[in-house]
C-alpha cells in the first residue's frame, strides 16, 4: 500500500490535490485545513498517505503530520465513521485543538463541525476520550487552548492564498467570513464562507 508521496503539487481542488510523482498523478484527499497548507501548484511536496481500498474505489488520504494521521486512524475506527467523515472532523479543528476537545468530552463543540451532529459527537467522545490521551502532541500536553482569532484569521488568509487568490482578495474574504459567522465558527465554516464571498464577488 502507498504510505508516502514525495513529488510536485500538480493541481488543487476544494477537497483534494493531485500530486505528480515521476510522471504519475495521484489524487489525494485532504482535510480543508491540510489542503490550505499545501504548497502552491508546481511546488515540491512530501505527504503521508493512507490507502483505503473498497470494492468500488481505491482512495488515498493525505496528511501533513504524523499526529494528523494518527488522529485520522482513531476517528476512522469509530463505529459508523468512515474516512470521509474523519476528514470532515479534521477539517473542523486543528489537530491539537481536536485532541483536546475529545479528551475533555466537549460534545457541544464537536457537534458544531460540519457533518458531525450531536449523536456522532457523543460517539466520538465515548470511543476516543481515553484513546486520544495516548497521542503525544506537544501542544496538547501543554494544555493548548483554541487558536486565537488573529491566528485563525491568518490561517484562513494563508489557505486562500494557497488556492491562488491574491492577498487583498484573501484578506477581504477572511474579514467578511469572520463578520458573518462570528468568533465561534470553525475554520471549515469560515473557509467555506470565504470561498462563497470570493465567488460572489463579496
Curated annotation (Swiss-Prot):
Residue ranges for the region (Flexible linker) are 143-147
Gene Ontology MF terms in the entry:
ATP binding; four-way junction DNA binding; four-way junction helicase activity
Could you tell me which residues belong to the region Domain II? Answer: 65-143
One Pfam family recorded for the sequence: HHH_5
Subcellular location(s): the record lists:
Cytoplasm
InterPro entries on file = DNA_helicase_Holl-junc_RuvA_I, NA-bd_OB-fold, RuvA, RuvA_2-like, RuvA_C, RuvA_C_sf
What UniProt keywords are attached to this protein's entry? Cytoplasm, DNA damage, DNA recombination, DNA repair, DNA-binding
What the entry lists under NCBIfam families is as follows: ruvA
Q: What does this protein do?
A: The RuvA-RuvB-RuvC complex processes Holliday junction (HJ) DNA during genetic recombination and DNA repair, while the RuvA-RuvB complex plays an important role in the rescue of blocked DNA replication forks via replication fork reversal (RFR). RuvA specifically binds to HJ cruciform DNA, conferring on it an open structure. The RuvB hexamer acts as an ATP-dependent pump, pulling dsDNA into and through the RuvAB complex. HJ branch migration allows RuvC to scan DNA until it finds its consensus sequence, where it cleaves and resolves the cruciform DNA.
The entry's free-text remark on domains says:
Has three domains with a flexible linker between the domains II and III and assumes an 'L' shape. Domain III is highly mobile and contacts RuvB.
What name does UniProt use for this protein?
Holliday junction branch migration complex subunit RuvA
Tell me what organism the protein belongs to.
Myxococcus xanthus (strain DK1622)
State the encoding gene.
Answer: ruvA
Amino acid at each position: 500500500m502507498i504510505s508516502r508521496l514525495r513529488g510536485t503539487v500538480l493541481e488543487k481542488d476544494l477537497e483534494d490535490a493531485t500530486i505528480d510523482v515521476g510522471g504519475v498523478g495521484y489524487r489525494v484527499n485532504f482535510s480543508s485545513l491540510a489542503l490550505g497548507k499545501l504548497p502552491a501548484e508546481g511546488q515540491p511536496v512530501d505527504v503521508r498517505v493512507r490507502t483505503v481500498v473498497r470494492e468500488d474505489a481505491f482512495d488515498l488520504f493525505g496528511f501533513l503530520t504524523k499526529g494528523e494521521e494518527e488522529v485520522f486512524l482513531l476517528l476512522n475506527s469509530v463505529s459508523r465513521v468512515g474516512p470521509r467523515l474523519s476528514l470532515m472532523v479534521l477539517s473542523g479543528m486543528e489537530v491539537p485543538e481536536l485532541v483536546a476537545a475529545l479528551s475533555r468530552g466537549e460534545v457541544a463543540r464537536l457537534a458544531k463541525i460540519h457533518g458531525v451532529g450531536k449523536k456522532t459527537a457523543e460517539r466520538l467522545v465515548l470511543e476516543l476520550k481515553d484513546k486520544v490521551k495516548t497521542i503525544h502532541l506537544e501542544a496538547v500536553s501543554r494544555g493548548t487552548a483554541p487558536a486565537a482569532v488573529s491566528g485563525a484569521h491568518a490561517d484562513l488568509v494563508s489557505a486562500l492564498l494557497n488556492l491562488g487568490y491574491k492577498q487583498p482578495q484573501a484578506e477581504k474574504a477572511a474579514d467578511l467570513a469572520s463578520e458573518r459567522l462570528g468568533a465561534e465558527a470553525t475554520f471549515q465554516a469560515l473557509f467555506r464562507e470565504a470561498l462563497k464571498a470570493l465567488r460572489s464577488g463579496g
